[in-house]
């Protein structure tokens, strides 16, 4: 079907209605994930997804997202415009159906969109239902059509407000303050997602503007190189093993597949997968196909060209894990009827996709390596080093496994364990130093709180191979205490081999990093975060990792004692106390370390579940998180300096 024919067919008849909208306001989390920061930002993504669907169909070249001074958000595109003619079944304009009926839209009609994204296809009506007000303006059929809504309800009939030579859709909405915990959109979070979408849709221009403040930020994203540019962006602070990006692209079949990958001298891998522009953070059948193809193609090339050079008395075979060391890869597939596992679309379940991706990627990588033999040789040499490191790590892992409590042996000697054995109720505090560890052991709730003091330096996981990492005493203690096992090779379906990491064996469902509030404490905290992100990311993904927030100051007046967690809180506290009682001196103590607090104070301020503040560690964007750790903990000194200078003012709320 030609673009002209398809454009003519996109009318009210294309809008399919599946169900009503009543439940959205009662249970918003079912539709947008939660009512916190993540759910709020999903409102923007849902509207933008409509514009991206137009781009996928070949009718949209530019999308503009604007944060307005009043707190609302506007999304403007130059697509065909949502149909405005009457819907036969609903007896109302099609645009009103799209805005007021759940699961209504062109994405459910195969003639309008071959593929589309969106949060399980719930559509922009969910945004309407969760907004105090919203208006939509459509340029189509020679006119500008507008309709206004409040809490999802139309306030007037669709009316023509002017003439239009061009086409497009503009949606402006203000989130409902009675539903969301905060309606303050974060520029950086939206910018990262829009950048991602621009990479995934080469040639599409996406503009973001912040008009909430004078001279606010502004970005324009447009990447003609697509995924190849995306890989270079993710890899910019790594030392590349080869400059040329390996690309595989096939748009001719029923399932378009687009892959870009490159190796660096790093020891970590960073593989991002997308289905219809949706980041499938849990992978799925497309990732399984990619992994299988990569391993087979590399081994085939190595064998064919006699590149596996074993040392004397050495038995060596290269696994998928070896070929993933230092790999940065992006996999994007377009699936007409994707089957996602989970409400938030994080794992692809279509069985047929694995074979399709496997075949295309296998053939594509083999062709590339045959045309670029020097790159193939470098990759195989790196994989051989990884295999030898893996062999050494296996011995270290066996030692840890023998020490594991679940293997029937003892826990680390310095661990003060809790008496409860139900992981749901148990907490493990990773505490900096023996002094603070001693106070924590005395002040804790022995029933549910375990303490593991960290005496030596935790190794930097960003710059250490697996065998060196596992020889570090502190890392060994952490792994043994957690009880999950560690690492190991995953098979080509993404499942780990028996005896290696198993999240089901985690002994504590709260792992709390508790360090001093000084530079050394921050460094140790960052090293631990790097370790968990790079080597035990399932713990972060499961929501098990937290940061303790100890106070910086103790403010006292007579027998009254208060704790302040930052300078601003301290100043307000002292000012109030001086006003209330001018005759009694206000005392101030700054805590340089956790060890300066006695067990009672440490319990009251940092460990008591009733009064403490914990920060849950989450990953909003895998690409951004990988880049953050790479900048902070990698070998590029200049990149680290630039990152720190840029983000120094945010350190109180640094979100990794």
Model regions: which residues?
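Conserved ATPase-coupling elements of RecA-like P-loop NTPase cores
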Residues: 57-59, 84-87, 521-524
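Short conserved segment of the HATPase_c
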Residues: 82-104
